[in-house]
């Protein structure tokens, strides 16, 4: 098998309503979510199976996609489909409470876990980059990261600006599937933003979906707009078509002072995701095929200049942070020895949430009916009545976020809350309040499901940044708990060799059996995050574990000795 069958001039959309294509909702759900990942409203390049994040794909090639669809259509509720890097490799008899699909994407033996070896396998058709939610079939468009980015900006505002970002502006780059969330997140947090993107098509997509408000005609126009809006205290997002490796150094030379600096280009993948300065996108794609080593070097050289500019802002005292694309590592590889002087966003702003199992809980309406999402929004408010911040997020999301593909919602909630919400949603399906089942999943970027020393597990207080037993245990436990599909990936977010991570999705079809699975999965999944952080010695996590009654033998022993 080769990688050649990766283009098909077609459009895919998931079925809507209650008519089944597969044999049950347990198999209809992964089928619809696979197709939803490739909906033109959702995916970055669906005709080549690319969902987001450089070359993050939903299936290895179109032949594999067709066989996955065929397998899911005929799969029984006591069988499990195995997916190996986007290729359906087996169907096995299991049982009704086992996952219907088990997915392993992009995993390599550590010595060979690098882009060079992966790209060789990719060209031969032996591997597929699954990113995080591309190959695990639970991507919901840019909304999937909006709240996490919003929470980051809000916390940065608390730490650096007295709790308000009014009249402030964020400098960043990248308007792809993940980076496209930044302008809207900044606006929702009360800040202006200047968002640099080298592909006009991506700017057009974000303008169309209302994730970005305006496009500047050129560099000077962008700065003039920023000055106008910040002076008026307005939160407006501005896109600028250009190369960050050229624009950020120029801003430094001019003495321009943003209030916050970050980046979400696809720097994790220098061959496919970061345009070298001075190159056109067409040249970049052409030479990636004929001169991959030269292209990687050129991209990383530009990243080094990009990071040098970020360091200059950092040394000016401007809050500057990596937003999880591994650009600091790429720059360090090119000789920028102090690349890690500015922090990643997780240790800087998010880790206290992870210690309580709080993370990106998401759900999608298989009916295709937006009213089902609005009803679940109301249920979240009803069941979590005192969280004004969460209510504000849900109100803003309804007002500002356009659904992409099947209607979906994300909100950050933690241990105890997730199971409560899942069971309530299942009951809403049972009573007919929702018109069809829903699926509940999450990003792999979560409390207990990832090992990524340059992102989610950066600067762990016990030094366990690179220990990847935790996402493996998370995947095993979600499988044992009865998630509908479970995934285990390598390289998402930060690229080959730098992360391992797992995901899960559970279906709410209104049945008693589903309720039992939901209760197990949506408790155990965030509980592994509390466990992981408690094991690392975080007091917030230890206290949460005690409050939630988690049985963590070594934590109990440690606390007993302290007493």
Swiss-Prot record:
Which cofactors are named for this entry?
NAD(+)
PROSITE patterns, alphabetically? UROCANASE (PS01233)
* Reaction equation(s) it catalyzes: 4-imidazolone-5-propanoate = trans-urocanate + H2O
Tell me the Gene3D superfamilies matching this sequence: Urocanase like domains (3.40.50.10730), Urocanase superfamily (3.40.1770.10)
Q: Does the keyword NAD apply?
A: yes
User: Pfam families under this entry?
Assistant: Urocanase, Urocanase_C, Urocanase_N
Q: Which residues bind NAD(+)?
A: 53-54, 131, 177-179, 197, 202, 243-244, 264-268, 274-275, 323, 493
One biological process term in Gene Ontology: L-histidine catabolic process to glutamate and formamide
Q: What is its EC number?
A: 4.2.1.49
Instruction: Give the signal peptide, or none.
Output: none
Q: Which domain of life is it from?
A: Bacteria
Q: Report keywords, A-Z.
A: Cytoplasm, Histidine metabolism, Lyase, NAD
Localisation: Cytoplasm
Catalytic residues (positions)? 411
Keyword Lyase found:
yes
Q: Which InterPro entries match?
A: Urocanase (IPR055351), Urocanase-like (IPR023637), Urocanase_C (IPR035401), Urocanase_central_sf (IPR038364), Urocanase_CS (IPR023636), Urocanase_N (IPR035400), Urocanase_Rossmann-like (IPR035085), Urocanase_sf (IPR036190)
Q: How is the cofactor bound?
A: Binds 1 NAD(+) per subunit.
A single cellular component GO annotation: cytoplasm
Q: In which pathway does it act?
A: Amino-acid degradation; L-histidine degradation into L-glutamate; N-formimidoyl-L-glutamate from L-histidine: step 2/3
Q: By its UniProt entry, which PANTHER family does this protein fall under?
A: UROCANATE HYDRATASE (PTHR12216:SF4)
HAMAP family recorded for this chain?
Answer: HutU
Q: Which family does it belong to?
A: Belongs to the urocanase family.
Among NCBIfam families, the record links this protein to: hutU (TIGR01228), PRK05414.1 (NF003820)
From the Swiss-Prot or TrEMBL record, give the protein name: Urocanate hydratase
Q: Which gene encodes it?
A: hutU
């Amino acid at each position: 098998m080769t990688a050649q069958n990766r283009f098909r001039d077609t459009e895919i959309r998931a079925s809507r309503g209650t008519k089944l294509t597969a044999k049950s909702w347990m198999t209809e759900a992964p089928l619809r979510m696979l197709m939803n990942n490739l909906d033109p409203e959702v995916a970055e390049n669906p005709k080549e199976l690319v969902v987001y994040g450089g070359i993050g794909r939903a299936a290895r090639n179109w032949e594999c996609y067709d066989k996955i669809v065929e397998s899911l259509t005929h799969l029984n509720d006591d069988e499990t489909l195995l997916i190996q890097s986007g290729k359906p490799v087996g169907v096995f008899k299991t049982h009704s409470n086992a996952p219907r699909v088990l997915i392993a994407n992009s995993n390599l033996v550590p010595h060979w876990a690098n882009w060079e070896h992966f790209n060789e396998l990719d060209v031969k058709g032996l591997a597929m980059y699954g990113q995080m939610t591309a190959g695990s079939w639970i991507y919901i468009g840019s909304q999937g990261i909006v709240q996490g980015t919003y929470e980051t900006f809000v916390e940065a505002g608390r730490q650096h600006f007295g709790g308000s970002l009014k009249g402030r502006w964020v400098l960043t780059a990248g308007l792809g599937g993940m980076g496209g969330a930044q302008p809207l997140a900044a606006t929702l947090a009360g800040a202006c933003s200047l968002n640099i993107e080298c592909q006009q098509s991506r700017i057009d997509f974000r303008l169309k979906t209302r994730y970005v408000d305006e496009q500047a005609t050129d560099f000077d126009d962008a700065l003039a707009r920023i000055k106008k809006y910040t002076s008026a205290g307005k939160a407006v997002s501005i896109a600028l078509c250009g190369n960050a490796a050229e624009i950020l150094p120029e801003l430094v030379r001019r003495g321009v002072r943003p209030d916050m600096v970050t980046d979400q280009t696809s720097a994790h993948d220098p061959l496919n995701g970061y345009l070298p300065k001075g190159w056109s996108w067409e040249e970049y794609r052409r030479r990636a095929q004929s001169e991959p080593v030269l292209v990687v070097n050129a991209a990383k050289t530009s990243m080094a200049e990009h990071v040098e500019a970020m360091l200059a802002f950092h040394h000016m005292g401007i809050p500057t942070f990596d937003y999880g694309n591994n650009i600091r590592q790429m720059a360090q590889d090119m000789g920028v020895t102090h690349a890690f002087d500015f922090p990643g966003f997780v240790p800087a702003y998010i880790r206290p949430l992870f210690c309580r199992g709080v993370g990106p809980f998401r759900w999608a309406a298989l009916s295709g009916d937006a009213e089902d999402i609005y009803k679940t929004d109301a249920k979240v408010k009803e069941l979590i009545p005192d969280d004004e911040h969460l209510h504000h997020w849900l109100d803003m999301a309804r007002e500002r976020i356009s659904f992409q593909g099947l209607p979906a919602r994300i909100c950050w909630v933690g241990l105890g809350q997730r199971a409560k919400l899942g069971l309530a949603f299942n009951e809403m399906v049972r009573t007919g309040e929702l018109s069809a089942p829903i699926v509940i999943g999450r990003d792999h970027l979560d409390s207990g499901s990832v090992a990524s020393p340059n992102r989610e597990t950066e600067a762990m207080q016990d030094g366990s940044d690179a220990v990847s037993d935790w996402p493996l245990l998370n995947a095993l436990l979600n499988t044992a708990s009865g998630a509908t599909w479970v995934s285990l990936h390598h390289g998402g977010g930060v690229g080959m060799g730098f992360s391992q991570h797992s995901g899960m999705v559970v279906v709410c079809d209104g049945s008693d059996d589903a309720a039992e699975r939901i209760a197990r999965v949506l408790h155990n999944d965030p509980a592994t995050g509390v466990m992981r952080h408690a094991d690392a010695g975080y007091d917030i996590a230890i206290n949460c574990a005690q409050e939630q009654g988690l049985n963590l033998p070594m934590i109990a022993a440690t606390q007993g000795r302290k007493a």
